[in-house]
């Protein structure tokens, strides 16, 4: 235990919090260009073909982003918006693609949770 005199000379240092999404650089979203669109398999015990893409961001970072929802129109050179948020069963995937923004279309025929998938309110 430090004495009061030691603490006066050199106060206790604060722990520096590490960001979970370093490529965003404290921004809510970032724009980038798809360099590769592919599917990958999750870790045990799950089984699927998850849609992901490699993205070269405007700040020079190259990250992997998950494409949520059923079906997408992304291909190489598509310009997309990414946000933070990891995918628990895909190692190394720490970002999500924002559906319905820039070149990424919203999910077709989506009726519920539409705001998360970039879908306008259907005509009644």
UniProtKB/Swiss-Prot annotation:
It comes from the Bacteria. GO terms for cellular component: ribosome; small ribosomal subunit. Keywords: Ribonucleoprotein, Ribosomal protein, RNA-binding, rRNA-binding, tRNA-binding. The keyword rRNA-binding applies. InterPro entries: NA-bd_OB-fold, Ribosomal_uS12, Ribosomal_uS12_bac. One of its GO terms (biological process) is translation. One of its GO terms (molecular function) is structural constituent of ribosome. PROSITE patterns: RIBOSOMAL_S12. Part of the 30S ribosomal subunit. Contacts proteins S8 and S17. May interact with IF1 in the 30S initiation complex. PANTHER family: 30S RIBOSOMAL PROTEIN S12 FAMILY MEMBER. Belongs to the universal ribosomal protein uS12 family. With S4 and S5 plays an important role in translational accuracy. Interacts with and stabilizes bases of the 16S rRNA that are involved in tRNA selection in the A site and with the mRNA backbone. Located at the interface of the 30S and 50S subunits, it traverses the body of the 30S subunit contacting proteins on the other side and probably holding the rRNA structure together. The combined cluster of proteins S8, S12 and S17 appears to hold together the shoulder and platform of the 30S subunit. NCBIfam families: rpsL_bact. This is Small ribosomal subunit protein uS12. The lineage of its organism: Bacteria, Pseudomonadati, Pseudomonadota, Gammaproteobacteria, Enterobacterales. The gene is rpsL.
């Amino acid at each position: 235990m430090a004495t009061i005199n030691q603490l006066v000379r050199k106060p206790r240092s604060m722990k520096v919090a590490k960001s979970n999404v370093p490529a965003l650089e404290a921004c809510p979203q970032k724009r980038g260009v798809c360099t590769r669109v592919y599917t990958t398999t999750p870790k045990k015990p799950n089984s699927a073909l998850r849609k992901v893409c490699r993205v070269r961001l405007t700040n020079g970072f190259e990250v992997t982003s998950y494409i949520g929802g059923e079906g997408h129109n992304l291909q190489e050179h598509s310009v997309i918006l990414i946000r933070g948020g990891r995918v628990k069963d895909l190692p190394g995937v720490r970002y999500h693609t924002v559906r319905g923004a820039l070149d990424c279309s919203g999910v077709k025929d989506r009726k519920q949770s539409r705001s998360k998938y970039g879908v306008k309110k259907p005509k009644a």
